[in-house]
């Protein structure tokens, strides 16, 4: 679990830094618009929208920009309809990779994703080729110095499936259906959540050497830089050396 937690923290910090340079605002706006179009503009009754708005706020997006994206989604105007799609493949070292996208042009998206895999020693697979290696779950990372016993008690009582503590970081894993119940219970108790999201979590991590890790990181970075890509997941287990170099 520690490997999952550290990688999530690195991705979180990198995302905030990238957002300050304007690299991910387009993706965030796209997710907010689609979430509002699919589930309505009320955050209290639309969990996907609530999570998307939280990500945007964490990335320092202005509330006016968020509200405009919600209005576009609810109104169903401005541009082609976005379609959610997922691509599966293998990266360097046989690492399994899932790529979640939102796009108005499937041909463009699959071409760009395939090019990224090919350029960095991977290959795009067929539907179902690696998705069975992942489970859709909720992940909640608590802010530092939160009371461990209290967090564990509240999380488990609310339906969490696992709670782990390492180096002062508390990570909570939930079934999808219990994710918002657990998150709300923690926040209602006055506990501080650092980050939370629904994720595709690898059932088993695959250890890779540092050379493979460097190639894999280049592939993941290239995928994440594509406008149509929203999330990239892998089952790689990075060494402490690599994790520290990215921290």
Swiss-Prot record:
Q: What are the GO cellular component annotations?
A: cytosol
Per the record, the GO terms for biological process are: regulation of DNA-templated transcription
Q: Which UniProt keywords apply?
A: Cytoplasm, DNA-binding, Transcription, Transcription regulation
Any one GO MF annotation of this record: DNA binding
Q: Where in the cell is it found?
A: Cytoplasm
Primary residence = cytoplasm
The family annotation for this protein states: Belongs to the TACO1 family.
- In Swiss-Prot or TrEMBL terms, this protein is called Probable transcriptional regulatory protein lpg1286
């Amino acid at each position: 679990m520690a490997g999952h937690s550290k990688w999530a923290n690195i991705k979180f910090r990198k995302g905030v830094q990238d957002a300050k340079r304007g690299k991910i605002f387009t993706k965030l706006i796209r997710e907010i618009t689609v979430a509002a179009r699919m589930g309505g503009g009320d955050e209290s009754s639309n969990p996907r929208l609530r999570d998307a708005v939280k990500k945007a706020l964490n990335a320092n997006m202005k509330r006016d920009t968020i509200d405009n994206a919600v209005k576009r989604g609810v109104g169903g105007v401005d541009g082609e309809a976005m379609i959610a799609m997922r691509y599966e493949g293998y990266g360097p070292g046989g690492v399994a990779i899932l790529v979640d996208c939102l796009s108005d042009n499937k041909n463009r998206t699959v071409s760009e994703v395939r090019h990224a895999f090919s350029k960095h020693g991977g290959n795009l697979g067929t539907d179902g080729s690696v998705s069975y290696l992942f489970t859709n779950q909720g992940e909640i990372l608590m802010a530092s110095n939160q009371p461990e016993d209290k967090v564990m008690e509240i999380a488990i009582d609310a339906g969490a499936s696992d709670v782990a503590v390492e180096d002062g970081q508390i990570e909570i894993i939930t079934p999808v259906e219990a994710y918002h119940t657990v998150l709300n219970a923690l926040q209602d108790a006055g506990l501080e959540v650092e980050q939370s999201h629904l994720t595709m979590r690898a059932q088993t991590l695959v250890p890779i050497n540092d050379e493979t890790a460097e190639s894999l990181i280049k592939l993941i970075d290239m995928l994440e830089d594509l406008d149509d890509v929203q999330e990239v997941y892998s089952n790689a287990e990075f060494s402490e050396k690599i994790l520290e170099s990215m921290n």
